[in-house]
Amino acid sequence: MITVEKIGGTSMSAFQDVLANIMLRDPKQVNGRVYIVSAYAGVTNELLEHKKTGQPGIYAKFASGDDYAAALDALTARLKEINRGFVPLGLPLAVADGFIEKRMSELKEYLDSMRHVLASGYLKRESVLLAAREMLAAIGEAHSAFNSVEILKAKGHRALLLDLSGFDDDDPLTIDERIHKSFKGVDVQSQVVVVTGYTKGIEGIMREFDRGYSEVTFSKVAVEIRPGEAIIHKEFHLSSADPGIVGAGNTVIVGRTNYDVADQLADVGMEAIHPKAAKPMELAGVPLRLKNTFEPDHPGTLITKDYVGEMARIEVIAGSDKVTLVEIHDPNMVGTVGFDLQILEIFKRYGISYILKATNANSITHVIWEKSVTPAFVEELENAYELVTTRPCAMVCVIGSNMAIPGVLARATQVLADSGINVNCVSQSFRQVSMQFVIERPEYKKAVAALNLALCLGGKKAA
């Protein structure tokens, strides 16, 4: 069976475990596998910005006109230090260092040229900065993919690098066209194929998907070659709740679910898979498996299109404490056709997508990511409507593929009430795949722990 497999950055940094637990675990199943690899942990954060904290990286230095050359040199030194750590695995150091030195030198030349173009004023600044961001993003995956192939070759395996970053390719191809062209004539069955998580395309993968680009490459490759299974290897299982909140011993591995549930998780920021990556695989009928790199014997969680649990159960408690409630109250709303359309036109102008929406006769409440709430956005709403309320909050969700049974909503609400947690807003669609509760931000972790204990663990907490 041919598989397409994505390996995340944290796992890539522990490449000895990737070799032992994934790539070379079964000597009879080394070939016929396509790996889409992320950059080593932290590298893309240094190139762009920290994914979670927003701390600026080299991109910000370039965009602001600061000295990015010194930062590039420092990163080159760090990448070579990473190389040295893989020498015991067979990485030929001189070859690996030569590759990254050349690639970083080329990157600096491109950025220098872009700096001159920016100074000329002939091109839109935004277009040049987007191109720079694309080039910076491409470096990390090219580095890790190149090293992976060299290590596999050193161990006597047939390995092929498909560098989709297009650094030395000026063909004006779309992302799909580049993937199709790169795989044309490739015999996947007889070798290991390692693919960069970044793909160059005229539409710009960063512009379209930002930091979710490696999963989008993974998805598009899976749709291109139609494997028996697509697999994502992470440093954790898809579990009933965040182990960092409830404790590793107080979770249940999901095991089986469907793409609808995966969409719900992605919508609230839980990193199962990027929503724009999941949809093409769902439509193509490609089953997706999520596995823990460090527990190779566990089958993980299989996601398919039509799966519905045989027994009614809650599969995941998810959510976020980094959201904001935006409520619009206006008496003119009553009976007015298309009133909410006017609101969403403002949302669209600011590029804002909501996570939850609830309405009554004269109020509409949206929950959005707090980073989307800018003074200009709020001011435009206040100028258009009678009363606008913004409030930092948290949202906790009860999610499952088979929850359409009487009493689930009541039970979840009672669990929150028993924990002294007030529900400020609630939403559930007819499909009953996700129940969303808006609560006060300081109550978030307590809510997750309480719901997980009562609904997923049956009230039995680990000692």
How does the language model describe each region?
Residues 189-190, 284, 350:
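Structured helix-beta-strand junction loops
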Residues 1-273, 278, 438-440, 459-463:
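Nucleotide/pyrophosphate-binding catalytic subdomain
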Residues 166, 236-237, 295, 361, ...:
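Conserved beta-strand edge residues that scaffold enzyme active sites
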